[in-house]
Amino acid sequence: MEDFQKDRKEVIERSLRQGLQYMLTVGTDETYFKKVVEIINSYPAVYGAIGIHPHNSKDYNPQLGKIIAAFLKDKRIVAYGEIGLDFFKNYSPRESQIHAFQLQLEVAKRSRLPAIIHSRNAKDETIQILSKDYDGNLGGVIHCYSYDLAAAKKFLDMGFTLSIPGTITYKNSHSLTDVVKFTPIDKLLAETDAPFLAPHPHRGKRNEPSFVRLTIEKIAQIKGKGVEEIAMNLKRNFEKLFLHEDRGEGAEEPADQG
């Protein structure tokens, strides 16, 4: 969030001028939760998500779970996340990541909020946990999708949407291109992962929401469809996933905190 502290208003206005109707900002630990609420209450086009990112899983505890549950009552908080596993950097022990992930999945199911799943270098473990917990009551999105087609098919079979980042515009994105070709358009989203992973030709620079247009154009090219047709489909997917009214009342933490 610090990356946009000085020019957040200008960045959002630039995105709106590009025709972007919805944006999602994510609070990945307790220090950012109130900032997310401040942002979503200041900009009508921006919605929020909160959760404990796998990097911060070692800090997850029962009290923090209660704090999250309270924030989830805000109707403009439309998703639980990012939650998941990151075995690339391992900022938190793997056992802590798995424990926090499983507990937060239970809260997401009870709250009927979609989960935003972060998974890096943890494909098999993520699929195993989601498969074990899958009962038809958990939905969500695999954020910044980076795995192969075989994994994509497993996530899709569990009902998840795949969110495509700006890396799809890179020359070496052959595996991700195969995923986009295969995945039904109603199970795709486009994202920036700002400030990271700016699409070509902005690679290496600070990413921002307005750049998502470049990702959408690439998806349209791969699908052999018009850009506006793809954009409209992705808009509907966002609305269906995040802006539905079927929210649960009980977002309490599981009794067993382990």
PLM features per residue range, with description:
Residues 1-258:
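Mid-domain alpha/beta scaffold segments of enzyme catalytic cores
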